[in-house]
C-alpha cells in the first residue's frame, strides 16, 4: 500500500479533478528530486528510471542548472527572437559547438512535437516537395503535423482526416527494400529515430541509417533524424547518429537539451534554413532567456562531467546485469547506452506497477510487452544494482494470471453472497 492510499492527498485529488483527463494518473504526488532520486509528498524515495520520459539525463535539480535559472530569473525571462539576447546567443554557440559538423543553423522552440512541426515545414520549403517517409512503430509527436509521422493508429485515428496521412509513406524500420521503394523524387524527407523509443527501444542498424543517408542524397530528399529522446548523451554519444557515422540534413532536439526546462530545437544545414521565407515559421516562448540560461549550464555540465561516457559505461553495466537475470518471462534485453528495453513474453504493465508500488522504482512501457528504463546518466552503480534486484524480485513475485484468477474468484464469491443475501431477504418478506 502506498502512502497516498493510506493518507489521501489533496494535491492528487485536485489534479485529477481539474486536469483534462487525457493522462492516466499515478496515485502518487512527487514533490522533490535530486540526481536519480525523487520523493513523494509522504517522504518515500524512488529511483527514477523515467526522468520525465528521458528529460533529466543530467539528473534532477543539477546544481549548475538550478543556479543558472535562479540568476537569470532575476535578470530577464522573456524576450522575443526578433530581439537578440545574450543568453540566446550564448546557448546557440554552445549547441552548435556539440552538433555534428554542418548542422550550424537552429530554430528554437519549446517541445519535441514543435521541433518536428518545424522540421516538416523546413523540409517542404527546402525541397519544394510535400511527401514524407516515416517508420512503422515510430513516434514523432502528437500535434497534427507531427502526428502524421507517428505510426501508432490509436494516436491518429480519433482525429480522422485532420491528420495528413496521405502524404506519408510508412516503411518497416530496418527494411532496406521497403525504404528504397518508398523514397522517390517526390519525397521531401525521410524521418526516423536512430533508436525507436515508443516502438520498443529498438536501435537501428548502421546499414539501415547509412542507406537512408545514401538514398536521400540520391533522390534529392532530406534525412531528418529524430534525436528528441536519443540526443544529449542518452545513448553513450552526444547524439545517437554518431554511433552510425551519419550526418543528417536536420535533427529534432528536445528533452535533455536544457536540464529540465521546456526547450527544443530543429538543427539543420544552412541550405535548409536559407530556403524558409522570412516569417515562414515562429514561436512566442522558444529561445526565452530563462531556458537558454538553463541550456548553457546543462550543455557545459554534460561536457565537463563526461555524461556521454557515463551513459555508455553504465548502460553496458546495466544491460549486463539485466541479461544475467534468469527468468523465463524475459524474451530480450536491448538498447543503446542508458536507453534500455526489456521485452517480456507477457504484458509489462503489472510489472511496471509493482516496480513503483512495491519496490520504489519508476520505469515505463514501450509497446505493451517492453519495460523501458531511462535512468539519468548520473545514476550510481549501486542504484543500478538496486533497480535490477528490484526487477528480478518483481519478475519472480508478480503473476498476472494468478492475480486475475483470484480477482475472478473474488467476484464470483461476492456474486454468490449477493444471491444468498437476496434469497434470505425474499424469505424474510
Curated annotation (Swiss-Prot):
Name of a matching Pfam family: Aminotran_3
Keyword annotations: Amino-acid biosynthesis, Aminotransferase, Cytoplasm, Lysine biosynthesis, Pyridoxal phosphate, Transferase
Subcellular location field: Cytoplasm
Chain residues that bind substrate: 142, 283
InterPro entries assigned: Aminotrans_3 (IPR005814), Aminotrans_3_PPA_site (IPR049704), Class-III_PLP-dep_AT (IPR050103), LysJ (IPR037537), PyrdxlP-dep_Trfase (IPR015424), PyrdxlP-dep_Trfase_major (IPR015421), PyrdxlP-dep_Trfase_small (IPR015422)
Biological pathway: Amino-acid biosynthesis; L-lysine biosynthesis via AAA pathway; L-lysine from L-alpha-aminoadipate (Thermus route): step 4/5
Cofactor(s) in the UniProt record: pyridoxal 5'-phosphate
Biased composition (Low complexity): 411-429
One GO cellular component, as annotated: cytoplasm
Superkingdom as given in the UniProt entry: Bacteria
GO molecular function: identical protein binding; pyridoxal phosphate binding; transaminase activity
Cofactor note: Binds 1 pyridoxal phosphate per subunit.
Family stated for the protein in its record: Belongs to the class-III pyridoxal-phosphate-dependent aminotransferase family. LysJ subfamily.
Purpose: Catalyzes the transfer of the amino group of L-glutamate to [LysW]-aminoadipate 6-semialdehyde, generating [LysW]-gamma-L-lysine.
Identification of the protein by name: [LysW]-aminoadipate semialdehyde transaminase
Gene name of this polypeptide: lysJ
Amino acid at each position: 500500500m502506498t502512502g497516498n492510499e493510506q493518507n489521501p492527498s489533496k494535491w492528487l485529488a485536485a489534479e485529477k479533478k481539474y486536469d483534462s483527463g487525457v493522462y492516466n494518473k499515478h496515485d502518487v504526488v512527487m514533490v522533490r528530486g535530486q540526481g536519480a532520486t525523487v520523493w513523494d509528498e509522504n517522504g518515500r524515495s524512488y529511483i527514477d528510471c523515467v526522468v520525465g520520459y528521458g528529460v533529466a539525463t543530467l539528473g534532477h535539480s543539477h546544481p549548475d542548472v538550478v543556479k543558472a535559472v535562479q540568476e537569470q530569473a532575476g535578470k530577464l525571462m522573456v524576450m522575443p527572437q526578433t530581439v537578440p539576447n545574450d543568453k540566446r546567443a550564448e546557448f546557440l554557440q554552445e549547441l552548435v559547438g556539440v552538433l555534428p559538423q554542418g548542422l550550424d543553423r537552429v530554430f528554437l522552440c519549446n517541445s519535441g512535437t514543435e521541433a518536428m512541426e518545424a522540421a516538416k515545414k523546413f523540409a517542404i520549403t527546402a525541397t519544394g516537395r510535400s511527401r514524407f517517409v516515416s517508420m512503422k512503430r515510430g513516434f514523432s509527436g502528437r500535434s497534427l503535423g507531427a502526428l502524421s509521422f507517428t505510426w501508432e493508429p490509436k494516436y491518429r485515428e480519433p482525429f480522422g482526416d485532420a491528420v495528413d496521412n496521405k502524404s506519408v509513406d510508412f516503411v518497416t524500420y530496418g527494411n532496406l527494400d521497403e525504404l528504397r521503394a518508398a523514397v522517390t523524387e517526390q519525397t521531401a524527407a525521410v524521418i526516423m529515430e536512430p533508436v525507436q523509443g515508443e516502438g520498443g527501444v529498438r536501435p537501428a542498424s548502421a546499414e539501415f541509417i547509412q542507406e537512408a543517408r545514401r538514398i536521400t542524397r540520391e533522390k534529392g530528399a532530406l534525412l531528418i533524424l529524430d534525436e528528441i529522446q536519443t540526443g544529449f548523451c542518452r545513448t553513450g554519444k552526444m547524439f545517437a547518429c554518431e554511433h552510425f557515422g551519419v550526418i543528417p540534413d536536420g535533427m529534432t532536439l528536445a528533452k535533455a537539451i536544457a536540464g529540465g526546462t521546456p526547450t527544443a530545437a530543429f538543427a539543420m544545414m544552412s541550405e535548409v534554413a536559407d530556403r524558409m521565407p522570412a516569417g515562414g515559421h515562429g514561436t512566442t516562448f522558444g529561445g526565452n532567456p530563462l531556458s537558454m540560461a538553463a541550456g548553457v549550464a546543462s550543455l557545459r555540465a554534460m561536457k565537463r562531467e563526461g555524461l556521454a561516457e557515463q551513459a555508455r559505461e553504465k548502460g553496458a553495466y546495466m544491460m549486463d546485469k539485466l541479461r544475467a537475470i534468469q527468468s523465463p518471462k524475459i524474451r530480450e534485453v536491448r538498447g543503446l547506452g542508458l536507453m534500455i528495453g526489456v521485452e517480456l513474453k507477457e504484458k509489462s504493465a503489472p510489472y511496471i506497477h509493482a516496480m513503483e508500488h512495491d519496490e520504489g522504482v519508476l520505469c515505463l512501457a514501450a509497446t505493451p510487452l517492453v519495460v523501458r528504463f531511462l535512468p539519468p546518466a548520473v545514476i550510481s552503480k549501486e542504484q543500478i544494482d538496486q533497480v535490477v534486484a528490484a526487477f528480478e524480485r518483481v519478475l519472480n513475485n508478480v503473476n498476472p494470471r494468478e492475480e486475475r484468477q483470484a480477482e475472478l474468484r473474488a467476484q464470483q464469491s461476492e456474486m454468490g453472497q449477493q444471491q444468498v443475501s437476496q434469497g434470505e431477504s425474499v424469505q424474510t418478506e
